[in-house]
Amino acid sequence: MENYVPFLVSHWRTVGLISVSIAAGVALGQLNQTHERAANKSQRVHTNSSIKAKQVKRESAIEQINEIEDDDEQSLEDQDVLPILFQYEKPSEADSIRRSEEFYRRMNQRRSVREISSDPVALEVIENIIKTGGTSPSGAHTEPWTFVVVSNLEMKQQIRQIIEAEEEINYKQRMGDVWVQDLQPVGTTWVKEYLTEAPWLILIFKQVHGFKRNGQKKIHYYNEISVSIATGFLLAAIQEAGLVTVTTTPLNCGPSIRVLLGRPVNEKLLLLLPVGYPKVGATVPDFKRKPLHDIMVHYQ
């Protein structure tokens, strides 16, 4: 070592630079190894993610295949449905205008009436109204509706108790000041006398799904839209029969009422219609309907 001292003293800058370069090279090599290990790890993670993504995609494809198979099975169930000739007699233009105008005039008398008489209404009238609702179109002709009609006073009292208990909470806590204020012109509260005074209650359930002949679930396409359209048919039939109703949406009451009525879990309460004749002297808010030019857009 003593023999190298004069050399180191004379060339210490060069030796220092070489040492620093060597150290930097070693550090760089270690850094590259670290990056390489990280890259390999990232590649493995990416590969695993890709594998998982492919697995999810594969499982999704399997689910789609299963759905297609379900649809095929449903089609097989309906394979005996053959087309028939549509029975139709075209009216004259004058007759079509007359009929449409007469129907409009009758429907324009429809109002939401909350003061409903307890005067009896024949069961046959209610059955005809329900049959009319059953003529409504539905997604893939699944007819995803159940209309529960109640005339039993004790059952109506239990339904009213459930609804009023929830409605009081709705008005005081859930709905908010703006919603409650918007209802003031209508004059509604959580007290619903018509639920026990009306001779009939029609509870409208949507079937979230049905069941095939083999017991498997059957898809009910657009079930809520289909049932809502059917409700429109019911409202028209009620008006045509000379009866009144008010469309109610029992918020947060569905499960309790479903259990009370013994309905299956695939049915969800959508709407409730109390049906009967109006009380003598019944009043309604003096609302005006929008004119035609506000609700119709015509492109020629």
Swiss-Prot record:
<dbReference type="GO" id="GO:0006570">
    <property type="term" value="P:tyrosine metabolic process"/>
</dbReference>
<feature type="binding site">
    <location>
        <begin position="138"/>
        <end position="139"/>
    </location>
    <ligand>
        <name>FMN</name>
    </ligand>
</feature>
<feature type="binding site">
    <location>
        <position position="192"/>
    </location>
    <ligand>
        <name>3-iodo-L-tyrosine</name>
    </ligand>
</feature>
<feature type="binding site">
    <location>
        <position position="140"/>
    </location>
    <ligand>
        <name>3-iodo-L-tyrosine</name>
    </ligand>
</feature>
<feature type="binding site">
    <location>
        <position position="140"/>
    </location>
    <ligand>
        <name>3,5-diiodo-L-tyrosine</name>
    </ligand>
</feature>
<keyword id="KW-0472">Membrane</keyword>
<dbReference type="InterPro" id="IPR029479">
    <property type="entry name" value="Nitroreductase"/>
</dbReference>
<comment type="function">
    <text>Catalyzes the dehalogenation of halotyrosines such as 3,5-diiodo-L-tyrosine. Likely to also catalyze the dehalogenation of other halotyrosines such as 3-bromo-L-tyrosine, 3-chloro-L-tyrosine and 3-iodo-L-tyrosine.</text>
</comment>
<dbReference type="GO" id="GO:0140616">
    <property type="term" value="F:iodotyrosine deiodinase activity"/>
</dbReference>
<feature type="transmembrane region" description="Helical">
    <location>
        <begin position="15"/>
        <end position="31"/>
    </location>
</feature>
<dbReference type="Pfam" id="PF00881">
    <property type="entry name" value="Nitroreductase"/>
</dbReference>
<keyword id="KW-0285">Flavoprotein</keyword>
<keyword id="KW-0288">FMN</keyword>
<dbReference type="GO" id="GO:0016491">
    <property type="term" value="F:oxidoreductase activity"/>
</dbReference>
<keyword id="KW-0812">Transmembrane</keyword>
<keyword id="KW-1133">Transmembrane helix</keyword>
<keyword id="KW-0521">NADP</keyword>
<feature type="binding site">
    <location>
        <position position="138"/>
    </location>
    <ligand>
        <name>FMN</name>
    </ligand>
</feature>
<feature type="binding site">
    <location>
        <position position="167"/>
    </location>
    <ligand>
        <name>3,5-diiodo-L-tyrosine</name>
    </ligand>
</feature>
<dbReference type="InterPro" id="IPR050627">
    <property type="entry name" value="Nitroreductase/BluB"/>
</dbReference>
<feature type="binding site">
    <location>
        <begin position="247"/>
        <end position="249"/>
    </location>
    <ligand>
        <name>FMN</name>
    </ligand>
</feature>
<feature type="binding site">
    <location>
        <position position="171"/>
    </location>
    <ligand>
        <name>3-iodo-L-tyrosine</name>
    </ligand>
</feature>
<feature type="binding site">
    <location>
        <begin position="110"/>
        <end position="114"/>
    </location>
    <ligand>
        <name>FMN</name>
    </ligand>
</feature>
<feature type="binding site">
    <location>
        <position position="171"/>
    </location>
    <ligand>
        <name>3,5-diiodo-L-tyrosine</name>
    </ligand>
</feature>
<feature type="binding site">
    <location>
        <position position="289"/>
    </location>
    <ligand>
        <name>FMN</name>
    </ligand>
</feature>
<protein>
    <recommendedName>
        <fullName>Iodotyrosine deiodinase</fullName>
        <ecNumber>1.21.1.1</ecNumber>
    </recommendedName>
</protein>
<dbReference type="InterPro" id="IPR000415">
    <property type="entry name" value="Nitroreductase-like"/>
</dbReference>
<keyword id="KW-0560">Oxidoreductase</keyword>
<feature type="binding site">
    <location>
        <position position="192"/>
    </location>
    <ligand>
        <name>3,5-diiodo-L-tyrosine</name>
    </ligand>
</feature>
<feature type="binding site">
    <location>
        <position position="167"/>
    </location>
    <ligand>
        <name>3-iodo-L-tyrosine</name>
    </ligand>
</feature>
<dbReference type="GO" id="GO:0005886">
    <property type="term" value="C:plasma membrane"/>
</dbReference>
<comment type="similarity">
    <text>Belongs to the nitroreductase family.</text>
</comment>
<dbReference type="GO" id="GO:0010181">
    <property type="term" value="F:FMN binding"/>
</dbReference>
